A protein has these predicted regions:
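C-terminal or mid-to-C-terminal helical accessory/interaction module adjacent to the motor/catalytic core
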Residues: 93, 135-217, 254-258
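Amphipathic alpha-helical transducer elements in NTP-driven molecular machines
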Residues: 9-16, 33-36, 40, 76-87, ...
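Intrinsically disordered, low-complexity regulatory segments
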Residues: 1-162, 166, 465
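Metal- or metallocofactor-binding catalytic centers and their adjacent structured scaffolds
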Residues: 232-265, 271, 542
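Phosphate-rich ligand and nucleic-acid binding surfaces
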Residues: 221-223, 253-254, 324
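Conserved short loop/turn motifs at secondary-structure junctions
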Residues: 1, 99-104, 181-183, 254-263, ...
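Basic, low-complexity terminal or inter-domain segments flanking catalytic cores
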Residues: 2-3, 90, 118, 173, ...
């Protein structure tokens, strides 16, 4: 029999249906010659630092850097039962071969391989590589299974990425958390992304607006401008000089221009436009596209390609017809699609661009949630636009001369609306006010024409600061980060991947380093402080983009994983050495949230409220009172802040409601600190006489 392992249950069900594995079991489906099971995402992950040495359970500066000599992996606790199912199936004597059917990409490969290795499986496996969950795509995929070894380099790149994130995250987070006594999460990709938010916020906060003036002259429907005059006095002088005077059309230039249709959607571009049009976060869009993929209505979402392959031409034509029939917004659209525009085999690696599927023909679109309908409309609109006709217009540039001053204006006249007609139809459905096109149609004039008695006016303007990032513009910045560091022959990958960028943004928000205000993403005070204290090698988008490029080269077999990780380890070690201590003032940078409850009985330093504990602020002192320590837990009590304060103040505290298994009733006692300076603080109990 053949064991097929998918990434999640819904995908497994789609595959099982095609293979005829319809008999449901505990954690898998069986039928014919197949058993189909699933992973629930990451079942096996890199072990936490404390798994290597129990002393790492407590965060200490002196333990850094932590770099495993031999990497350990552990089963995710809440998914242990499914791992047992998979492990047992892999060892089942009936199973002679496996099929890796996790998502066709770097992370999907890692999910399967870690389970395969952790289970100690050595049976041969094939790889299912598909871009759609339609029945026809699954059948075709199983007819063209590939040898699993063909993806060894993909796995190597995925594992290298995971290890690099572990090394930078564990050491960077522990280093700055122990130095500043506040949990400061540092990430290989997360931190440079935060740095971009902070840099933009800094430019906005230090921006000083400057006033300038524009002078306008015109007659009838024709008005031209002299822009960016520095002073009001000069602008008024120019206007006064031109008022009621004669202006001559000194220059007239007409040029026919075209705007090519946009490319198809990759994930990042789809996330950007969903944010711009609907206000969806990157994560919301990814979740919606993933759901539509699992419903077989969209192709694979985590793609970085905006093209399809030439063997998809007939399918693309079919899908375009289905979009016009099934999506009411486009029911009146008549198109003659140019499929060649979106076809390029050389620009499709793992997956082609995101498209609707032919399964859309069978779907009652109105029965879908509104959010899913919006994504389908967006993807459908882009497919029709991308294969539509060019937008053509005539641009006219006119210069007016008046009293030795030159005033200019531009106008446009649409010749063929082309693909923009579909885009305008889509935008009209949103019922949101679009910005007026600054270039309007101009009246018919000729070079040398004279305008008698023109009117003149002055308007006041101010320079504007940069805009705060939205998820749209941040995704764009992440995608192009560090591009100027590479030569023209290097394929640029930016910060993160299409699959990970949404999660990175969410982590920044959840960790309290960034916040959403409307559509804007703004760094918090802690976020700004964190970027200020971190060195450039951690905050530099260019360096992280270079790492991402190296991972891609590992995947292609052009770079060595060990060399890459050695560089990460070296950088991390240098980082720790660069921060041997902080001044008291610097250590208080994040200190506004720290609460002192007493003095340390060992060294006299302040004792602060921590996460689940009360710790000595002196890094050299190990004194710490844990809320859930063995002594208090055995008596079904928690060491509260009130108790901790009294223990530090008096050395003892009267505690009520203590439990003992020997008696049914609770009792009271005096708890004393019995600290001998060891690793753990001890207590002793006294009773009233």
């Amino acid at each position: 029999m053949i064991l097929v392992i998918a990434e999640k249950p819904s995908v497994a069900q789609s595959i099982a249906k095609v293979l005829g594995a319809t008999s449901r079991k505990d954690g898998y489906m069986e039928g014919g010659n197949y058993i189909v099971s699933w992973c629930f995402g990451h079942l096996v992950e890199l072990a936490d630092a404390s798994s290597y040495d129990e002393r790492y359970a407590k965060w200490r500066y002196d333990d850094l850097p932590i770099v495993p000599e031999s990497w350990m992996f552990e089963v995710t606790k809440d998914k242990a039962q499914q791992f047992k199912v998979l492990s047992a199936l892999m060892k089942d004597k009936r199973i002679t071969e496996l099929v890796c059917a996790t998502d066709a990409g770097r992370e999907g490969e890692l999910i399967f391989r870690l389970v395969y290795d952790k289970a100690g499986c050595t049976k041969p496996f094939k790889r299912l590589w598909i871009s759609s969950l339609e029945d026809s795509a699954i059948r075709e995929g199983f007819q063209h299974l590939r040898d699993g070894k063909e993806y060894d380099r993909l796995y190597e790149a995925a594992l290298s990425r995971s290890k690099a994130d572990w090394i930078v995250g564990i050491n960077g987070t522990r280093l700055f958390t122990t130095l500043y006594h506040k949990k400061l999460v540092v990430g290989r990709v997360q931190t440079p992304t935060l740095a971009m938010l902070v840099e933009r916020d800094g430019k906005i906060s230090t921006f000083q607006k400057e006033k300038y003036f524009n002078v306008h002259v015109g007659k009838g429907d024709l008005t031209a401008d002299l822009e960016k005059v520095k002073t009001e006095e000069e602008a008024k002088r120019i206007a006064a000089a031109c008022e009621k005077k004669q202006a001559v059309v000194s220059s007239l230039k007409r040029e026919t221009k075209t705007v090519n249709p946009p490319k198809l959607y990759d994930l990042t571009t789809l996330q950007r436009e969903a944010n711009r049009y609907y206000g969806f976060t990157a994560q919301q869009t990814l979740d919606l596209v993933q759901t539509l993929y699992e419903k077989k209505l969209l192709t694979y979402p985590r793609t970085d390609s905006q093209f399809i392959t030439d063997d998809m031409e007939d399918t693309a034509r079919q899908v375009i017809s289905i979009v016009c029939r099934q999506l009411p917004l486009f029911s009146d659209v008549s198109v003659t699609p140019d499929i060649a525009r979106v076809t390029d085999n050389s620009k499709v690696t793992d997956h082609h661009a995101i498209l609707p599927t032919v399964q859309l023909e069978k779907q009652d679109v109105s029965a879908l949630p509104q959010s899913e309908q919006k994504i389908l409309n967006l993807v459908g609109m882009r497919l029709l636009c991308a294969t539509g006709e060019k937008h053509t217009y005539a641009e006219t540039q006119i210069s007016l001369s008046c009293e030795s001053y030159t005033f200019k204006t531009k106008g446009k006249t649409v010749i063929q609306n082309g693909w923009k007609a579909i885009e305008e139809l889509f935008k009209a459905s949103l019922k949101t006010k679009e910005k007026d096109d600054p270039m309007k149609s101009l009246p018919e004039v000729h070079e040398g024409d004279v305008l008698d008695g023109v009117s003149a006016s002055v308007t006041e303007h101010f320079t504007t600061p940069p805009m705060q990032y939205t998820e749209d513009t941040l995704l764009s910045a992440m995608e192009t980060a560090g591009n100027d560091q590479f030569d023209d022959d290097t394929e640029k990958k930016g910060l993160g991947t299409p699959a990970t960028r949404a999660g990175i943004i969410e982590k920044l928000v959840k960790s309290g380093f960034a916040e959403r205000k409307g559509k804007s993403l703004i760094p918090t005070k802690d976020g700004c402080n964190l970027v200020c204290v971190l060195p450039e090698q951690i905050t530099s988008p260019a360096m992280t983009a270079e790492w991402e490029n190296t991972l891609m080269e590992i995947e292609r077999g052009n770079a060595d994983a060990d060399t890459f990780l050695s560089g990460i380890v070296q950088m991390t070690g240098d980082l720790v050495k660069a921060y041997p201590f902080l001044s008291d003032a610097e250590a208080q940078r994040f200190g506004t949230g720290k609460e002192e409850i007493g003095k340390c009985p060992r060294c006299g330093s302040p004792v602060y409220v921590g996460k689940g504990n009360f710790y000595c602020s002196n890094k050299e002192c190990s004194f710490c009172l844990w809320e859930d320590n063995k002594f208090f837990s055995s008596k079904k009590k928690k060491l509260t802040k009130k108790i901790a304060k009294e223990l530090l103040d008096k050395g003892w505290c009267r505690v009520t409601g203590l439990y003992t298994p020997k008696k049914p009733q609770l009792y009271d006692a005096v708890i004393r600190l019995d600290d001998s300076g060891g690793k753990y603080v001890s207590f002793k109990m006294e009773f009233d006489r």
